[in-house]
From Swiss-Prot:
Biological classification of the source: Bacteria, Bacillati, Chloroflexota, Chloroflexia, Chloroflexales
Family: Belongs to the universal ribosomal protein uL5 family.
Record's GO cellular component terms: cytosolic large ribosomal subunit
Organism: Chloroflexus aurantiacus (strain ATCC 29366 / DSM 635 / J-10-fl)
Protein name: Large ribosomal subunit protein uL5
GO molecular function terms attached to this record: RNA binding; rRNA binding; structural constituent of ribosome; tRNA binding
Length: 180
């Protein structure tokens, strides 16, 4: 079973990008490399159960078991010691990556209050795109009654595009709702 977005990429996006940027080879066409989803859980310093809830939410959203991230340095003002769990992260590749991006663009982003599109200025200059979501409940997979706290999450989309222009063209054709 192929993922809907991967099929769209191969059948529609690749030929369109080859024509737009005058690529000679299919291998020059930008593609998605990975999507990294991260949740920072600052309250995990006082409440150890907060990290478990964040891990469960992230696993539900992405369909993959997250890695618990730990503090690299101790910070006295935050009452934080090196090695304490302070977040969770998932790296998505392959079919799961395309499935997640499809659900993000078609289901989650339109459910955000007062949503007019994502910013074009969030590219990093090397063809990667980052966006933050204020609440995890925009994903339909999350049961509103079972969440303990509304948490935000960061999504980093890594592409093989050498510049922002090509990455924008790729994401726009894959269905990312940009604010124009």
């Amino acid at each position: 079973m192929t993922v809907r977005l991967r099929e769209k990429y191969q059948k529609e996006v690749v030929p369109a990008l080859m024509e737009e940027f005058k690529f000679k080879s299919i291998m020059q066409v930008p593609r998605l490399v990975k999507i990294v989803v991260n949740v920072g859980v600052g309250e995990a310093v006082q409440n150890a159960k907060a990290i478990e809830a964040a891990v469960n939410d992230l696993a539900t959203i992405t369909g993959q078991k997250p890695v618990v991230t730990r503090a690299k340095k101790s910070v006295a003002s935050f009452k934080l010691r090196a090695g304490m769990p302070i977040g969770a992260m998932v790296t998505l590749r392959g079919d799961r990556m395309y499935d997640f991006l499809d659900r993000l663009c078609s289901l989650a982003l339109p459910r955000i209050r007062d949503f007019r599109g994502v910013s074009r200025s969030s590219f990093d200059g090397r063809g990667n795109y980052s966006l933050g979501l204020r609440e995890q409940i925009v994903f339909p997979d999350i049961d509103y009654d079972k969440i303990d706290k509304i948490r935000g999450l960061e999504v980093a989309i890594v592409t093989s595009a050498p510049n922002d222009e090509q990455a924008y063209a790729l994401l726009k054709r894959l269905g990312m709702p940009f604010r124009d």
